[in-house]
């Protein structure tokens, strides 16, 4: 059985992945429609690039079970892929630090299709604050 790391265990160079998923045509269309976008690329069957953000969160959750808040996200698109393509996401913790009394970690994830880079996703997470009982 896999044991998940705690947020505190996520130090620089902590490897994440691989995560392999296939985004179906129906799921891809739901992503586009939920964003309120009717774009020619949707009609052409192209994957919705912000899916990379969701894959980064899924990749993170494979390794850390702590509840977190995503505080920053940046996605860079390198090329286009079609729906129903198998994607692979791998990542690494690039920084772990404290700011304003809260722990943070920064992750860079690469999403690829057939070995070719599709998207680079950069994200920052902080653990959800826990509050003591006032009883």
Annotated model-derived regions:
Residues 1-72, 132-135:
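Hot-dog-fold acyl-thioester-processing enzymes
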Residues 2-5, 81-88, 92-135:
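HotDog/MaoC-like acyl-thioester-processing domains
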Residues 49-94, 103, 122:
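Hydrophobic beta-strand-centered segment that forms part of the acyl-chain substrate-binding groove
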